[in-house]
Amino acid sequence: MSELNITSSQIQGDVTVTILHLSGHPHGNTENQLLDRARQAYEDGSKYLLLDLSELEILTSAGLRAIHKIFNMFTPQSDVEIIHQHSTEPYKSPYFKLVCPSPEIYYVLNIAGFLQNILIYNNMEDAVNSFNGD
């Protein structure tokens, strides 16, 4: 079982987007590593986060749990209230998105219900350009 490696970068589009590039295998022992990196980006003022899944080998329940916690971290309280008020309407986060999952990881995200709230892109350019600060 390989470890999870995380590198970080920022790209300036319409807004500054922090990208966490993941490679390897997120599991119970590395879940906090991913959460800590996302939390550090958030505390450093990042409002927009993109997870690059292109080098991720597998997505376990620990990885899904981490993605869910990061979604909550980057979703403002005002949006949470909108989600609860309009629970029958899908909410797509403008603050947290995913890019380049393998077909297997996309399938896991789909059956876990993550596609209802998190936008997923097939290439980095489209993903970065989707953040617009509205």
What function would you assign to each model-found segment?
Residues 1-21, 26:
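Short beta-strand/loop segment at the start of cytosolic alpha/beta domains
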Residues 28-117:
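Amphipathic alpha-helical interaction surfaces in cytosolic regulatory modules
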Residues 118-124:
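Short acidic-hydrophobic, aromatic-tinged amphipathic segments that line or gate anion-handling sites
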Residues 132-134:
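Short acidic DE-rich linear segments
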